């Protein structure tokens, strides 16, 4: 069959008629200069990926940057907002109620540039929890009131599970357990930041996360279209009828019925639009001469709440499982991290089954858990995650991987105390040994984005991530530096620590609640 050429902006794109050709081109590009221990793994993983993923983007050196700290993330956000010319599009769980400086920064950008448009997508339950007091919705409403919804399009996604008796019975403090808009996308013109961080003061100061900046118009366009699609399944903040109020509507322009009116029809319409987006995206395949591009990035997402139960077209879970199941020899290592350590059983099983000689799991110490010494029921969450860590170590022992897989707790001071930090990073790194140093591992694959790889991430929430595969030595060194920066605040934890340290004792009630409510954590 002949191949048709689709003319777009650089990098070039081509429509592919054969999935086998698609896979072989990527293999030639990546394996030609890849570190030799990783070649066979790369060949296997690219064959596997082509069955599941329809879209990828090629990057040249210096088109991906890793942001080092919360303060750098905040400074970069403000800088990008101020310099944006055409569009700012942001997806986050929530906007902190004290973030007036960020709102002012956006307002100033809109004032000085009449061509600029701003799009926000937040979670509708988390973003309105404090109403009528100050909250995400009231802050965004002030922008809409000043500039109008034509220039400031603010959307609030509400899970379709928030319906019927659940809407009436479940208190505001707990309704987030039904499902959330959890994507973290920060787009500015032709650049985009993918992260796990939200928009509040702790994420800008002392809450450890990860942040990658991608400089590509095509990549930014993809996430902008994704942002707009999920926004079209969401409520909109429009100009209030009374100054200071918040006016939230379901726009007639939305392509689906309001979920509160007909949940089944909403899911049918939304899932079809999502499936169309994921399928149409297969036509955006960047192809170039072998070796020209050093990095390939695959967007992967999880939209389980919007798909029928047995017809989930999401791409994240299957991709993560493929990454891990294709590790077949000891020349590959991995590091896994999640601040909220309630790992999906299938992912855990795949991690434990890998034939690694050295691998790390990084999770938050109880003293770095954002719920440490919080009020009410949430004060039990650090204990719940501690219990899950112990169960993981028991599984490691059961698999006879005690010498190969190390659980490490991250701690930097004590959260909510002077100079104390919390831990919110999540991700996966897959590494090979550096050819120049037989004792050193260097990543050539990482996953960056919003997912905590938990049971709820694959059942209740909307997640978006990116899988990066690279042979760019500078980027690999940056990835290694990022990982080392996290590891420097960790210490290994063993089953013996749980036996000897009374502070690691978890009560029976917390254990039972963790087992019952595990899907919500």
Swiss-Prot record:
Which gene name belongs to this protein? PGS1
Biological process per Gene Ontology, one example term: cardiolipin biosynthetic process
State its role: Essential for the viability of mitochondrial petite mutant. Catalyzes the committed step to the synthesis of the acidic phospholipids.
Domain of life the protein comes from: Eukaryota
**Pathway in which the depicted protein is active:** Phospholipid metabolism; phosphatidylglycerol biosynthesis; phosphatidylglycerol from CDP-diacylglycerol: step 1/2
Protein family (similarity comment): Belongs to the CDP-alcohol phosphatidyltransferase class-II family.
Q: Where does ATP bind?
A: 91-98
Q: What is this protein called?
A: CDP-diacylglycerol--glycerol-3-phosphate 3-phosphatidyltransferase
Substrates-to-products reaction catalysed:
a CDP-1,2-diacyl-sn-glycerol + sn-glycerol 3-phosphate = a 1,2-diacyl-sn-glycero-3-phospho-(1'-sn-glycero-3'-phosphate) + CMP + H(+)
> What does UniProt list as catalytic?
182, 184, 189
């Amino acid at each position: 069959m002949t191949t048709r050429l689709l003319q777009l902006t650089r990098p070039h794109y081509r429509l592919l008629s054969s999935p086998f050709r698609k896979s072989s081109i990527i293999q030639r590009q990546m394996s030609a200069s890849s570190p030799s221990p990783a070649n066979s793994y790369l060949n296997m993983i690219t064959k596997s990926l082509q069955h599941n993923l329809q879209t990828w983007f090629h990057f040249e050196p210096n088109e991906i940057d890793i942001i080092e700290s919360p303060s750098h993330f905040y400074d970069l956000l403000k800088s990008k907002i101020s310099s944006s010319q055409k569009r700012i599009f942001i997806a986050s769980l929530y906007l902190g109620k004290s973030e007036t400086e960020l709102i002012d920064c956006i307002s100033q950008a809109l004032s000085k540039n009449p061509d600029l448009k701003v799009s926000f997508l937040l979670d509708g339950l988390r973003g309105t929890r404090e109403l009528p007091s100050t909250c995400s919705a009231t802050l965004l409403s002030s922008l809409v009131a000043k500039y109008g919804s034509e220039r400031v399009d603010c959307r609030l996604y509400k899970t379709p599970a928030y319906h019927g008796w659940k809407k009436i019975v479940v208190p505001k403090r707990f309704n987030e357990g039904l499902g959330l808009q959890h994507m973290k996308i920060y787009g500015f013109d032709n650049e985009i930041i993918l992260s796990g961080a939200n928009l509040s003061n702790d994420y800008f100061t002392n809450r450890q996360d990860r942040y990658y900046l991608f400089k590509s118009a095509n990549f930014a366009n993809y996430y902008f279209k994704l942002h707009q699609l999920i926004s079209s399944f969401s409520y909109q903040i429009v100009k209030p009828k009374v100054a200071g109020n918040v006016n939230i509507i379901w726009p007639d322009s939305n392509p689906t019925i309001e979920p509160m009116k007909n949940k089944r029809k909403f899911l049918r319409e939304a899932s079809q639009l999502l499936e169309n987006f994921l399928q149409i995206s297969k036509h955006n395949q960047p192809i170039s001469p072998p070796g020209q591009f050093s990095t390939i990035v695959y967007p992967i997402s999880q939209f389980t709440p919007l798909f029928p139960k047995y017809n989930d077209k999401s791409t994240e879970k299957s991709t993560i499982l493929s990454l891990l199941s294709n590790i077949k020899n000891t020349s590959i290592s991995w590091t896994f991290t999640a601040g909220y350590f309630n790992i999906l059983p299938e992912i855990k099983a795949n991690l434990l089954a890998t034939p690694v000689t050295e691998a790390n799991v990084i999770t938050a110490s109880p003293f770095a858990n954002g719920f440490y010494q919080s009020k009410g029921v949430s004060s039990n969450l650090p204990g719940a995650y501690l219990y899950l860590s112990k169960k993981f170590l028991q599984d490691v022992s059961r698999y006879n991987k005690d010498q190969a897989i190390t659980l490490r707790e991250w701690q930097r001071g004590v959260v909510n105390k002077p100079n104390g930090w919390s831990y919110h990073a999540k991700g996966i790194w897959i590494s090979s040994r550096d050819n120049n140093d037989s004792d050193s591992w260097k990543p050539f694959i990482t996953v960056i984005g919003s997912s905590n790889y938990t049971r709820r991430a694959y059942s209740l929430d909307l997640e978006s991530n990116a899988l990066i595969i690279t042979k760019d030595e500078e980027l690999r060194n940056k990835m290694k530096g990022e990982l080392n920066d996290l590891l420097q605040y960790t210490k290994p934890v063993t089953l013996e620590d749980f036996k000897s340290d009374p502070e690691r004792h978890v009560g029976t009630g917390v254990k039972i609640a963790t087992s019952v409510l595990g899907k919500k954590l």
